[in-house]
Swiss-Prot record:
<dbReference type="InterPro" id="IPR018079">
    <property type="entry name" value="Ribosomal_uS4_CS"/>
</dbReference>
<dbReference type="Pfam" id="PF01479">
    <property type="entry name" value="S4"/>
</dbReference>
<dbReference type="Pfam" id="PF00163">
    <property type="entry name" value="Ribosomal_S4"/>
</dbReference>
<dbReference type="GO" id="GO:0015935">
    <property type="term" value="C:small ribosomal subunit"/>
</dbReference>
<dbReference type="GO" id="GO:0003735">
    <property type="term" value="F:structural constituent of ribosome"/>
</dbReference>
<comment type="function">
    <text>With S5 and S12 plays an important role in translational accuracy.</text>
</comment>
<protein>
    <recommendedName>
        <fullName>Small ribosomal subunit protein uS4</fullName>
    </recommendedName>
</protein>
<feature type="region of interest" description="Disordered">
    <location>
        <begin position="13"/>
        <end position="46"/>
    </location>
</feature>
<dbReference type="InterPro" id="IPR036986">
    <property type="entry name" value="S4_RNA-bd_sf"/>
</dbReference>
<keyword id="KW-0699">rRNA-binding</keyword>
<comment type="subunit">
    <text>Part of the 30S ribosomal subunit. Contacts protein S5. The interaction surface between S4 and S5 is involved in control of translational fidelity.</text>
</comment>
<dbReference type="GO" id="GO:0019843">
    <property type="term" value="F:rRNA binding"/>
</dbReference>
<dbReference type="InterPro" id="IPR002942">
    <property type="entry name" value="S4_RNA-bd"/>
</dbReference>
<dbReference type="GO" id="GO:0042274">
    <property type="term" value="P:ribosomal small subunit biogenesis"/>
</dbReference>
<comment type="function">
    <text>One of the primary rRNA binding proteins, it binds directly to 16S rRNA where it nucleates assembly of the body of the 30S subunit.</text>
</comment>
<dbReference type="InterPro" id="IPR022801">
    <property type="entry name" value="Ribosomal_uS4"/>
</dbReference>
<comment type="similarity">
    <text>Belongs to the universal ribosomal protein uS4 family.</text>
</comment>
Length: 204
C-alpha cells in the first residue's frame, strides 16, 4: 500500500467513517480509530471538538487541502451573498481537481489532483495544472489525449460505486461541462458533511 493510500485510509479510521465510499476502506470492517489505542471508548466531544472534526472531514474529503487554502475558501464564502455553508460547498465543488474527480476521470481525489498537476487536464481547450482553480458554469473540462489511455482513468470510468452528478454534463468519455454550482443536497457525499459546523468553527 502506498504512503498516500495508507494516509488516506488513516483519515477514514480517524473519522470513523468511509469518507469516500470506497469498498476497501478499513472502517468497513472495524469502527475504531488508528493505532494501538484505537479501540478505547471515546468520551463525549466538546462543541469545539465536534466543529473541528467536521472541518477535518470536509477538508480531508477534498484531498486534505491545506489549511491556508481551506480558510481562504471559507473567507470568500463568508463574503458572498447567501448562506455561508452553502457557498463554501459551492467553492469546494468548483475546484478543478474536484470536478475531475466528479467527472470520473480519476478514481480518487488524490489521483485527480495528480492528473491536473501533471498537465493532463484542459479547461476550455487550454491546459491547466492548478488543482485549486475555480471552474465556472459553462466551462468545459477535458482529458488530454495521453490521459485518455491511462489505466487509472479507465479504472475510474468503470467504477460502479459513484455516478457523475447532474450538475456535470457528460460529452463522451473524455469531456464534461460544469453546468451549475451545486447545493449541499446535490453533492453525492458518501457520508454526512456538516459545513454549518465548519462555519461555526471559523466564527469562534
Amino acid at each position: 500500500m502506498s504512503k498516500r493510500t495508507s494516509a488516506k485510509y488513516k483519515l477514514d479510521r480517524r473519522m470513523g467513517e468511509n469518507i469516500w465510499g470506497r469498498p476497501k476502506s478499513p472502517v468497513n470492517k472495524r469502527e475504531y480509530g488508528p493505532g494501538q489505542h484505537g479501540q478505547r471508548r471515546k468520551g463525549k466531544m466538546s462543541d469545539y471538538g465536534i466543529q473541528l472534526k467536521a472541518k477535518q472531514k470536509l477538508k480531508g474529503y477534498y484531498g486534505d487541502v491545506t489549511e491556508k487554502q481551506f480558510k481562504r475558501n471559507y473567507t470568500e464564502a463568508s463574503r458572498m451573498k447567501g448562506d455561508t455553508s452553502q457557498n463554501l460547498i459551492g467553492l469546494l465543488e468548483r475546484r478543478l481537481d474536484a470536478v475531475v474527480y466528479r467527472a470520473k476521470f480519476a478514481p480518487t481525489i488524490f489521483a485527480a489532483r495528480q492528473l491536473v498537476s501533471h498537465g493532463h487536464i484542459r479547461v476550455n481547450g487550454v491546459k491547466c495544472n492548478i488543482a485549486s482553480r475555480q471552474v465556472k458554469p459553462g466551462d468545459e473540462i477535458s482529458l488530454g489525449s495521453k490521459a485518455q489511455e491511462m489505466a487509472l482513468v479507465l479504472e475510474a470510468q468503470g467504477l460502479s460505486e459513484r455516478d457523475v452528478p447532474e450538475y456535470i454534463a457528460q460529452d463522451g468519455g473524455a469531456k464534461v461541462t460544469f453546468v451549475r454550482v451545486p447545493t449541499l443536497d446535490e453533492v453525492p457525499y458518501p457520508v454526512k458533511m456538516e459545513p454549518n459546523l465548519v462555519v461555526e468553527f471559523y466564527s469562534r
